[in-house]
Amino acid sequence: MTSLRTERGQEREDWTDEAFVRDWLRRQEERAPERERQFAMLCSLVPRSANDSFRYIDIASGDGSLDTVLLDRYPKAEATLLDGSPVMVKLAGERFSGTDKRVVAVQGDLETSAWLDAVKPPYDLAMSSIALHNLEDPTRLRELYAEIFDVLGEGGLFMNLDYMRAPSRALWPLYQKASRRSEGGFAMEIRSIRDYAGTADEHVGWLREAGFAPVDCFWREFRLAIVGGFKGSVKVTG
């Protein structure tokens, strides 16, 4: 979760409140089948074989749900889990505590460049899942993409799975209707969020501006998309 407190309609989200965070995580269970499918897609795009050793950072990692899946598929990977919420960092640490020395969970506020002080680049891979839409300012998001570019090593890949603005406002009700069935109550919760920072095409353009090449929208389904790009040469080993 990128910010400690965000406004969503009349609801005030407080990511420093453990009760709120645990309730939010509980509500995500309604989306378990979709989350598992999305995580599997992200993992399938990692350009590494199952036996490769590499370092990656999960940006706005939450409690580490994605990382459980990724580390199971890539057992030699080492992970940095970064989140702005101290509660999420605590829960992520507990998830892997004592059982997985490959993982470190750290706190960092993505609303400024201060998060860079909490991490130890370079990384071979950077990922984010359903989080960066909280950065509603396009300027800050473009800055963040440039910062992510800087923490990647040569040949590194960044992927962002997130909600993005519809190409046309007229399409939003249709996307909302189509996604409601798969996302259950969560779709109702965010139905008023019409102005995410950028369409998928705009995100791809911002990644290119940050230095990523090649870049692409790797996958899209209604308002969800995976956008990303490489830093330098593309090398696929798996």
What are these regions (language model features)?
Residues 142-154:
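A short glycine-rich, Lys/Arg-flanked "PGG" loop and its adjoining helix->strand segment in the class I
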Residues 127:
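A conserved beta-strand element that flanks and buttresses the S-adenosyl-L-methionine
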Residues 130-134:
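Short catalytic micro-motifs in class I SAM-dependent methyltransferases
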